[in-house]
């Protein structure tokens, strides 16, 4: 692809989300969501592979259907209330439809079946964009609507996402599918923060984005597409592979890594508000994710000695981590000591 066209596609990918995040009118928000979908489709299809074409088609259908639901609900709401403002009062029916549509855009369970398949059909960098930047605009709309969201629906979808993201990831061997189910599990925690403490939603989202960027850039640098690829990655760059495993455990929420910070704050708020059963369920739901991360780290670092392998892989290649990997990896591993400061400011 022509570098100028590629630069244009990347640049065009940024304004739609900004339009949605800064809008107070439902039509502008819907326009930003649609442009956001259309801007990433050429990036998905860049590899000219049948899997990429299939992923782009699925992504277009799902996102367009969700945007149509949002437009339908906002039109009905404007007809009944006489305004198009996002933060103003809405009817229960339209708010429920909007919530379901935004859950579909986020890939939250039970509307999650499209999410792992699409990530499996794209490149690592495209999967990174789908799991991070594409989540910002729908999350912003949910944050603007948090006073009107149906609490029961949010709790059910949050717990379901955390459970399905953890237990379904146990049987996966593809790293992109593992990251997909990790994203679904983190979406469940994000929904719980929307219901309980909206001021923690931004912190949870930023922490998730930092950990995901660090993990995806590390996987892309080491060219790890399956768990079996770790057998040769260890001989390439032991340090980078160790940091990758630590970032995966941070995604699982293992203390004393950064991923434990938002989970600690969410569980603390749940206990303070006398929702101990929900807190226990969320904590137990995070254990399967942590289990397959630790299992992956154990199989990689403790059972594979650093010896030369007689395989077709280019094991003599020594990948150099990108500057983005170094920065985000540092934040992924070392931000937990700032938790007391967050207690003082929230």
Give the positions of each predicted feature.
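Core, highly hydrophobic multi-pass alpha-helical transmembrane subunits of bioenergetic inner membranes
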Residues: 1-346
């Amino acid at each position: 692809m022509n570098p100028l066209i590629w630069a244009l596609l990347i640049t065009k990918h940024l304004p739609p989300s900004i339009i949605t995040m800064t809008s107070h009118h439902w039509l502008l928000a819907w326009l930003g969501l649609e442009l956001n979908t259309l801007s990433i489709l050429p990036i998905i299809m860049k590899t000219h592979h049948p899997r990429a074409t299939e992923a782009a088609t699925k992504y277009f259908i799902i996102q367009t259907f969700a945007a149509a639901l949002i437009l339908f609900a906002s039109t009905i709401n404007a007809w009944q209330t006489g305004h198009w403002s996002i933060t103003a009062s809405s009817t229960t029916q339209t708010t429920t439809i909007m919530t379901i549509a935004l859950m579909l855009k986020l890939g939250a369970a039970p509307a999650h079946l499209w999410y792992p398949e699409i990530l499996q059909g794209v490149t690592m960098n495209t999967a990174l964009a789908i799991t991070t930047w594409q989540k910002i605009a729908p999350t912003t709309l949910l944050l603007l609507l948090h006073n009107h969201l149906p609490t029961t629906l949010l709790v059910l979808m949050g717990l379901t996402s955390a459970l399905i993201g953890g237990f379904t990831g146990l049987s996966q061997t593809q790293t992109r599918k593992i990251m997909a189910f990790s994203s679904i599990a983190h979406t469940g925690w994000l929904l719980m923060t929307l219901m309980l403490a909206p001021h923690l939603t931004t912190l949870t989202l930023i922490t998730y984005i930092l950990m995901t960027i660090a993990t995806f850039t590390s996987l892309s640098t080491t060219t790890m597409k399956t768990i079996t690829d770790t057998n040769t990655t260890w001989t390439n760059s032991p340090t980078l592979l160790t940091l990758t495993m630590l970032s995966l455990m941070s995604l699982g929420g293992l203390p004393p890594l950064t991923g434990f910070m938002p989970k600690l704050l969410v569980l603390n708020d749940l206990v303070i508000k006398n929702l101990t059963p929900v807190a226990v369920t969320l904590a137990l739901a995070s254990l399967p994710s942590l289990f397959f991360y630790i299992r992956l780290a154990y199989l990689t670092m403790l059972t594979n000695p650093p010896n030369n392998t007689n395989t077709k892989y280019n094991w003599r290649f020594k990948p150099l981590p990108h500057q983005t990997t170094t920065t985000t990896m540092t934040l992924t591993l070392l931000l937990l000591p700032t938790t007391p400061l967050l207690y003082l400011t929230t």
